[in-house]
Amino acid sequence: MTTRRLMLVHAHPDDESLTTGGTIARYAAEGADVQLVTCTLGEEGEVIGDRWAQLAVDQADQLGGYRIGELSTALRHLGVDGPTFLGGAGRWRDSGMADTTPLHPRAFAGADLNEAVGALTALIDEHRPHVVVTYDPFGGYGHPDHIQAHTVTTAAVEKASWQVAKLYWTVIATSALETGLASITQLPPGCQPAPLDLIPTFADEKISAAIDVSGHREAKVAALRAHATQLTVSDDGSSMALSNLIALPIADIEHFVLVRGEPGVDTGWESDLFAGVEL
């Protein structure tokens, strides 16, 4: 039987665990070949707490190297080898948010598209994934690197000699966020639940797939905890927050929108990203 192959393209260390950690853990545990491609080292991230605060970009500027270690630990919890960085570790730099200082010369948001697309195309042709996952055109919440990851991934899937059967966007379903916020039993210290209107979501009718990752919750929570410079997880593992102290639920179901390929079900949501794929 042919091994199922999944590739996920994320912008920074921690993104893989935030939106797709359960999916990664589930398919890895099921024996699929799961490849994570991370586009930057996350050098511009806001550091939580005092212990590693001086690694930040405005001080020692050593955060990117430290986050390689965090990502490596997270991937071990999720059962995946790695990490793999687009163009090699350090080729492209975290661009920061759109309203921050001018772009660094190596910022991923300003990357030469021919080079970036070529680098990802080569990885697609090497690993031959049946399914690829990345962000929607808005990058989930508008981060320039997420938007660039969407652009690069979409172009690379089209350019690759290997024909990717299905391309998905990782998204948050509106109803799932509502249910998840209501189910939070503990908040990280000093945090408040996210207002519904603050988090970009996709209406349920736009969702294509809902992946049940409840059986891999422990791995997902452990992976999130590994990104300790960026995330705070509640003691009971029901919620997490970035440096903005806005808490989100840690979901048992992860949602996706299919944008290339045919759905594996005639009606309703898929429960398997590989549904309908001929292996």
Curated annotation (Swiss-Prot):
Cofactor(s) recorded in Swiss-Prot or TrEMBL: Zn(2+)
EC number: 3.5.1.103
Function per UniProt: Catalyzes the deacetylation of 1D-myo-inositol 2-acetamido-2-deoxy-alpha-D-glucopyranoside (GlcNAc-Ins) in the mycothiol biosynthesis pathway.
Binding site for Zn(2+): 12, 15, 146
Reactions catalysed: 1D-myo-inositol 2-acetamido-2-deoxy-alpha-D-glucopyranoside + H2O = 1D-myo-inositol 2-amino-2-deoxy-alpha-D-glucopyranoside + acetate
HAMAP family recorded: MshB
InterPro entries, A to Z: GlcNAc_PI_deacetylase-related, LmbE-like_dom_sf, Mycothiol_biosynthesis_MshB
Molecular functions per Gene Ontology: N-acetylglucosaminylinositol deacetylase activity; zinc ion binding
Keywords on record: Hydrolase, Metal-binding, Zinc
Pfam families (alphabetical): PIG-L
GO BP, one annotated term: mycothiol biosynthetic process
Cofactor note: Binds 1 zinc ion per subunit.
Entry superkingdom: Bacteria
Native source organism of the sequence: Mycobacteroides abscessus (strain ATCC 19977 / DSM 44196 / CCUG 20993 / CIP 104536 / JCM 13569 / NCTC 13031 / TMC 1543 / L948) (Mycobacterium abscessus)
Keyword Zinc: yes
PANTHER family from the UniProt entry: 1D-MYO-INOSITOL 2-ACETAMIDO-2-DEOXY-ALPHA-D-GLUCOPYRANOSIDE DEACETYLASE (PTHR12993:SF26), N-ACETYLGLUCOSAMINYL-PHOSPHATIDYLINOSITOL DE-N-ACETYLASE-RELATED (PTHR12993)
Protein name as annotated: 1D-myo-inositol 2-acetamido-2-deoxy-alpha-D-glucopyranoside deacetylase
Family statement drawn from the similarity comment of this UniProt entry: Belongs to the MshB deacetylase family.
